[in-house]
Amino acid sequence: AFYEKWLKYSILGEKDNTWRGRIKYYALSSGTTGSPSKRIPVTSEMIRSFQKSSLKQLSILHSLDLPQSFYSTSILTVGGSTKLNYKETHVEGDLSGILKKHTSFIATPFTRPGARISGVKDWSKKLDLIVEKAPKWDVGIIAGIPSWCIMLMERIVAHYNLDSIHDIWPNLYVYVHGGVFMDPYIQRLNLVLGRPIGLLDTYLASEGYFGYQEKTEQKGMRLLLNNGIFFEFIPFNTDNFDENGVVKKNAS
């Protein structure tokens, strides 16, 4: 297996094995439901790829005709703990923690909820801390999987007895989502909004940044090419896929 032959030795600190030099960071990915965590190598080149792709997606905001007040707001990322585990030969943890560690000092003042709250592992406690801080922030973009972000906004609205999240964050104009299909959450999202906001889908995983939605009025994502990821495509037919849509062993 690839792990036993190659990846295991990279994790133990061996150089020039699966990638040139020594791989310092590994993202912990649960993979399929119920399976043990996998360590996904995160090279310095991958980190730069994530950063470049994020900037590319943010650069499309100018097409949304946003008010000037939006451009001095913060980005609130709702996710798992960013606390990293320092091992003898490497550092591992959630991808968000690895990327947080490499956030430019220029961007740090515009990101929320900050290092202390981001590092909290207890989800309920983290929500309580964000709810407490919410009135002090001017959030223009919220990012994260729908269930987490909507739950947070619902708790803020309920805690402060608001009509909508826009009563506390009037400059909230964009929601960047991913991880799951958004459509089942639209009705619930609309209940906490005071007005429509731009929705942008993204396909970001521990294995790489694969694509993002370029226009709010058009569904579908742009595949990110020339971005450090090798894509190989095969025809979607019965020769290559079984009746459940799973790739066959000898597909070509």
Explain the meaning of each model-derived region.
Residues 1-27, 37-41, 45, 49-50, ...:
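Active-site diphosphate/adenylate-binding microenvironment
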Residues 2-6, 79-93, 162, 182-187, ...:
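Short, charged low-complexity intrinsically disordered segments located at boundaries
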Residues 7, 27, 51-62, 75-76, ...:
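Short, well-ordered alpha-helical packing segments
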Residues 12, 100-252:
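Active-site glycine/GP-rich loop and adjacent strand/helix microenvironment
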Residues 27-35, 205-208:
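Ser/Thr-glycine-rich phosphate-binding loops at phosphate-binding pockets of nucleotides
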Residues 47-48, 72, 76, 160, ...:
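Residue-level signal for alpha-helical context at structural boundaries
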Residues 53, 74-82, 212-216:
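Short amphipathic alpha-helical patches
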Residues 61-105, 117, 121:
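Conserved AMP-binding loop of ANL adenylate-forming enzymes
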